[in-house]
């Protein structure tokens, strides 16, 4: 007898439109089946972002992140089913948790031919919200039936265009230095050139030519940052025989010439840990190495991932620090920028890799920024940037005069507990530079959980809420919103609860603080008392 597998639903939710909860990537602690039924936009799973395909099943594995970016109309219909897999192996009497699941094989499956799927998913979500044991039992049974239908349909699904597209994408990425033609790629995919072009655009959001050029420019940037190659050599290694044509294409896509780009990247700077990259970017120095992730460092990932050749792990911020130190040691940077608050072991190992400039954690972000600028001989650029920042805060205060009299409370919700979240950036930028009023005193502890009753006692006019993007927290918050205790909070009654992402509010840096000012204006400029 073969191994037996059972799938236990952890959460089922049917979304009729995009929610702020899913705009920022969230962490999956189990397999997540994402059924996209209607609407346009993009879906990100880990570091891969692609246009949403109607009637398509996406699968996010455990310990990975996912999120939606809606199109301009912002409308989407989707169902999210979180599942735990259990397996009973031959000869065993019990089911044990299984992280390696056949569910992964269902990713990007076309589900249009599964009968009454939208209705079934809506009914599943409704069953999940019922509290009776019979409803929960039926829900588990219906989930097994749905998964059976998915696997059955996948066996008879003979169309595998997406796999062919992925195969050709990989070929482009690994053969960027060679001549690549549409005829060659379509032949490799086993479909006509017209069908291939249309399918490629559908699945990637880019034309074949755009993808090839982007791949070559990204490779060129990394060669410029990692080596002392001549421009002609870089052009040849990225598929361009004419270095002058390459220069024109490079400037068109990046806004600067290859010579200017290489001049800025001559010094190989590694930004180690949180916040340090935020002092380099305003000085127009893109680091050679830095921690990047689409969830934990989303801004830097979106804007600079193609420019940074050595990408350290930012998974759960610095959870993989030992792996990062090894990567840095292999990359051989010229200098490393780090906070001095890292562990003695990290400091010792960093010191053996390269020269390290430590920023003193007890000093202010302005001191950190000016110290970084002094090290890079960019003092005048730093002074100009700070003057511009001060002008931005002055303008923001004028724009937000109508809410200056309100009292703000920053909270973070993790699992089923609230905590005060008046961190250093919030205190110095929001309450300091922007001059808003706090609903709490500066000496209130932030590690201690607080009750809804205590939150009510603060009598805050506005609540700024950091919601941890993981299943238990999201489920609790959705239930909490239906309770009388929550609805009676004055900020809730006045519709002044603002959901915030941790980025940039937990980044103590020049770039992070500029983005806090900009985000505050965006959030509050339309709020009229």
From Swiss-Prot:
Q: Which keywords fit this entry according to its UniProt record?
A: Activator, Cytoplasm, DNA-binding, Transcription, Transcription regulation
**What Pfam families does the annotation carry?**
HTH_18 (PF12833), Peripla_BP_2 (PF01497)
Tell me, in a sentence or two, what this protein's role is. In iron-limited conditions, activates expression of the feuABCybbA operon, which encodes the bacillibactin uptake system. Acts by binding directly to a conserved direct repeat element upstream of the feuA promoter. Activity is increased in the presence of bacillibactin.
Alphabetical list of PANTHER family matching this protein: ARAC-FAMILY TRANSCRIPTIONAL REGULATOR (PTHR43280), HTH-TYPE TRANSCRIPTIONAL ACTIVATOR RHAS (PTHR43280:SF28)
Triggers of expression: Repressed by Fur in the presence of iron.
Task: Name its species.
Answer: Bacillus subtilis (strain 168)
Instruction: Identify the residues that the record assigns to the Fe/B12 periplasmic-binding domain, covering every copy.
Output: 268-528
Write down the SUPFAM superfamilies for this protein, in alphabetical order.
Helical backbone' metal receptor, Homeodomain-like
Q: What name appears for this protein in its UniProt entry?
A: HTH-type transcriptional activator Btr
Q: Can you say where in the cell this protein is located?
A: Cytoplasm
GO terms for cellular component? cytoplasm
Q: How does it assemble?
A: Binds with high affinity to both apo-bacillibactin and iron-bacillibactin.
What's the chief localization of this chain?
A: cytoplasm
